[in-house]
């Protein structure tokens, strides 16, 4: 669980650092130069409150969702025999953890988004554009990398422990197929991030007029390119793992599910002569 938690937190921490630095440079600093001295104080307070509450809530919620998988893995390592119903639950929960941490991250970023403008106040229209831009970039980061990294841990390390002879069903294959489809969407998000940052840099740099902000976007662009390479590697490993897990699920499936998956009603019946 600690490994998954760190893999989910790291992209969000990096996104929070970028969000703070970018908003400080393009919004708060110009506001103080315009004589709005309270903007700096309100921004600092809102950053502390939002990040403390957001990271605490996100961590607690993910620990709650991942705890059954952690306990199931501990029981497996201690030689405890797990019931088929519990194994089915653990397989589903294990595969969904990547999607859960991505949704938790995005939801918390969306909720936190309006807090900064409301706390600071006295914003110009361009400041709202910068807030939305920063939020969109951080949302992509918060969704993409936690999903791929946590899903990689689940498919590569954890899932096989919850497969036992006769315990798998057609629902397991269906969920594996869903994860197979989701991974393509997150890979496209990872690939879109560098292009989004470059486009925003070209559009916003003349408007911002800040060299530091341009450097931040440049660093994020190179970081997004490196992140895409990592995301592509995770994607390929997950793809191979899913193919193996589908074979294992089929091999350990029940005869009932085999009959449900394939319709033999049209085949001729061979009788005794």
Label each PLM-derived region with a short phrase.
Residues 1-222:
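N-terminal sensory and localization modules of signal-transduction and trafficking proteins
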Residues 169, 223, 227, 243-246:
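Sparse, context-dependent recognition of short Cys/His-centered cofactor- or disulfide-binding micro-motifs
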Residues 187, 223-239:
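Cytosolic-side ends of inner-membrane transmembrane helices, especially those
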């Amino acid at each position: 669980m600690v490994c998954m938690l760190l893999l989910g937190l790291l992209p969000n921490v990096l996104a929070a650092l970028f969000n703070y630095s970018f908003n400080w440079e393009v919004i708060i600093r110009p506001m103080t130069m315009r004589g709005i001295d309270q903007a700096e104080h309100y921004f600092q307070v809102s950053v502390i409150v939002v990040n403390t509450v957001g990271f605490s809530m996100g961590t607690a919620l993910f620990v709650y969702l991942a705890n059954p998988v952690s306990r199931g893995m501990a029981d497996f390592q201690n030689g405890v025999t797990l019931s088929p119903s519990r194994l089915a639950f653990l397989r589903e929960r294990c595969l969904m953890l990547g999607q859960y941490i991505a949704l938790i991250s995005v939801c918390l970023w969306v909720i936190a988004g309006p807090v900064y403008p409301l706390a600071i106040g006295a914003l110009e229209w361009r400041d709202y554009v910068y807030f939305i831009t920063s939020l969109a970039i951080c949302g992509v980061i918060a969704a993409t990398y936690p999903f791929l990294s946590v899903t990689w841990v689940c498919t590569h390390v954890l899932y096989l422990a919850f497969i036992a002879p006769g315990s798998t069903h057609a629902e397991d294959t269906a969920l594996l197929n869903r994860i197979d489809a989701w991974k393509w969407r997150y890979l496209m998000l990872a690939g879109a991030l560098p292009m989004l940052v470059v486009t925003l840099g070209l559009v916003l740099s003349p408007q911002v007029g800040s060299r530091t902000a341009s450097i931040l976007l440049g660093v994020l662009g190179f970081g997004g390119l490196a992140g895409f390479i990592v995301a592509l590697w995770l994607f390929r490993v997950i793809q191979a793992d899913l193919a193996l897990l589908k074979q294992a699920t089929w091999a350990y499936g029940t005869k009932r599910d085999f009959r449900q998956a394939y319709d033999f009603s049209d085949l001729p019946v061979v009788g005794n002569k």
